[in-house]
């Protein structure tokens, strides 16, 4: 799939768009909403774009549009209620420049904004057209708003955009949220709470996991954190993905148990997790597929939640970014000549060693010398990045159409070696990997016996 050429467009029709404001205006929303170091780090990367695909109820297939009309009305109303709790998502970024200091302050203005964006579109394709192909069709990118936008664009574009795309036999709910406001935990908590409100049909419903909007800042710093920039070109860049293929690979609970047992047996331990074993398999397999020289250094990075690693810990529902990418590395020769257990143990060590001291040290260094992440530097053609998490509640979001059939993502954060980890739709501990590679590397991976034998063959009657 050529990530830079999202064609053909098929017949995607944009029917309408509007902006949704909070149903009632919280008093706190009248104050500036300041960004933490973890939030500011994300200004030059892209929005989080995830979406769920649902089957239309049988009665909706020939009802002259009444079902979708009712669905849109309920989605808009429940979204307005959700935004009372998650009011920063209805705001816009604002910047104060301190030219004499050579610095600027970026924050969220929750007051002077039209609200969150809501789009209704129609696509003349079926669920099978989207989910059956071996590779994820490029049309999926167009099921999300804010395509290729950076988070800094949130000064002029909505921080949250919902695109509802009606298919011939289904509905795709695409949600784009500014990554300088949320990480994966906050993103899915918003999605989950919106679903709760939709199902409750009660404006006064008490959500089960209200977001904790109080900001976290390192000791003796904040809430005002200035960036040492005055011009956009000093810290904001656009990233264009190379030509890629994108595939979904399914791993059953039984297959993951075998991988875990193998890794622990090989390293003579019982501490390696299923996910660490799977990540080691992916790292080794992609490294083989790339045909790298034995003396080259390859790395594997894991996105890790800092909430529970701080002391004292942050609340589980802390709203905002609280993540880091931890990395382990080896020469290609070391990685491939040693076994799966050796690679999995290196990942295990990186995880267990990421503690309160490491987290605070990283943040304190940022305070001393602020910077932002740049996509082109996050992209390492010799390494693998494991993002998202199979622990997030991605299939508990019900919007009057039953359980979602599958999850797909947009253009954002795709590069060679990027892997996003999702729970399998059937549950039970299964995992689906969304894996992006250059076409020539994907072809080799598809012929890799160790990797493919660990996957579950595609079932034409079951999507993932």
Indicate residue ranges for each PLM-predicted region.
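A signal for specific C-terminal beta-sheet/loop modules enriched in small/flexible residues
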Residues: 2, 125-134, 449-464
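Detector for long, low-complexity, acidic/polar
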Residues: 34-38
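Short, surface-exposed beta-strand/loop micro-motifs that present aromatic residues
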Residues: 41, 159-165, 416-424
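Low-complexity, glycine/alanine/valine/leucine- and proline-rich hydrophobic stretches
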Residues: 379-461
């Amino acid at each position: 799939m050529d990530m830079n050429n999202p064609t053909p467009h098929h017949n995607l029709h944009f029917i309408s768009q509007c902006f949704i404001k909070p149903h009632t205006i919280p008093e706190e929303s009248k104050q500036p909403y300041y960004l933490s170091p973890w939030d500011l780090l994300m200004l030059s990367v892209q929005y989080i774009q995830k979406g769920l695909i649902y089957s239309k109820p049988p009665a909706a297939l020939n009802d002259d549009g009444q079902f979708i009309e009712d669905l849109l009305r309920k989605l808009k109303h429940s979204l307005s209620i959700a935004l009372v709790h998650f009011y920063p998502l209805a705001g816009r970024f604002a910047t104060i420049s301190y030219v004499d200091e050579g610095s600027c302050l970026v924050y969220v203005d929750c007051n002077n904004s039209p609200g969150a964006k809501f789009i209704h579109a129609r696509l003349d394709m079926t669920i099978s057209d989207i989910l059956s192909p071996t590779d994820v069709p490029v049309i999926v990118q167009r099921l999300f708003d804010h395509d290729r936008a950076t988070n800094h664009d949130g000064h002029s574009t909505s921080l949250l955009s919902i695109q509802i795309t009606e298919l011939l036999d289904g509905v795709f709910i695409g949600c784009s949220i500014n990554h300088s406001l949320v990480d994966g935990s906050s993103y899915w908590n918003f999605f989950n709470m919106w679903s709760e409100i939709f199902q409750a049909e009660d404006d006064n419903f008490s959500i089960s996991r209200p977001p904790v909007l109080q900001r976290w800042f390192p000791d003796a710093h904040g809430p005002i954190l200035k960036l040492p920039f005055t011009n956009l070109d000093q810290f904001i860049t656009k990233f264009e993905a190379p030509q890629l293929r994108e595939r979904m690979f399914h791993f059953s609970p039984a297959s993951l148990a075998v991988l875990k047992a193998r890794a622990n047996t090989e390293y003579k331990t019982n501490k390696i997790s299923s996910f660490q074993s799977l990540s080691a398999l992916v790292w080794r397999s992609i490294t083989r597929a790339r045909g790298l020289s034995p003396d080259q250094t390859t790395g594997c990075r894991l996105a890790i939640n800092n909430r529970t690693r701080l002391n004292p810990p942050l609340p589980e529902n802390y709203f905002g970014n609280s993540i880091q990418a931890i990395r382990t590395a080896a020469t290609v020769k070391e990685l491939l000549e040693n076994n799966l257990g050796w690679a999995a143990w290196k990942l295990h060590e990186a995880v267990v060693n990421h503690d309160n001291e490491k987290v605070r040290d990283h943040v304190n260094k940022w305070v001393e010398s602020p910077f932002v992440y740049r996509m082109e530097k996050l992209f390492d053609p010799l390494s693998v990045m494991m993002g998202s998490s199979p622990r997030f509640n991605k299939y508990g979001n019900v919007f009057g159409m039953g359980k979602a059939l599958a999850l797909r993502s947009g253009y954002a954060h795709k590069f060679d070696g990027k892997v996003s980890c999702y729970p399998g739709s059937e549950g039970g501990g299964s995992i689906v990997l969304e894996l992006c590679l250059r076409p020539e590397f994907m072809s080799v991976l598809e012929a890799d016996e160790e990797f493919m034998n660990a996957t579950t063959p595609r079932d034409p009657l079951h999507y993932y």
